UniProtKB/Swiss-Prot annotation:
Keywords: Chloroplast, Membrane, NAD, NADP, Plastid, Plastoquinone, Quinone, Thylakoid, Translocase, Transmembrane, Transmembrane helix, Transport. This is NAD(P)H-quinone oxidoreductase subunit 3, chloroplastic. NDH is composed of at least 16 different subunits, 5 of which are encoded in the nucleus. It comes from Nymphaea alba (White water-lily). The chain crosses the membrane at residues 9-29, 64-84, 88-108. Its EC number is 7.1.1.-. Its main location: plastid. Pfam families: Oxidored_q4 (PF00507).
Amino acid sequence: MFLLYEYDIFWAFLMISSVIPILAFLISGVLAPISEGPEKLSSYESGIEPIGDAWIQFRIRYYMFALVFVVFDVETVFLYPWAVSFDILGVYVFIEALIFVLIPVVGSVYAWRKGALEWS
């Protein structure tokens, strides 16, 4: 027989964490003042009057470096719990973590050889 009452805390947390953002959006939509005008439609540049066009194009190189950074940053976050409990997990989990690290490394070597990470 399944003991579903063990998951009551999980379901309560899930419902509370779903209701709070919805309530926050609803309350801010009701209480926020509605103001329309040229000030609302202009772009914000650190409190000074905007100069020139706000829509400028960025090179795709910025996005490539940002994506590589995010991939390795998320990988580091996922590897931290493994590193904390490394001594009790065993060799099998070590091999899995090695494969987990190897996949982004192979991907970045591929991108490097294709010239996606060249800044010129």
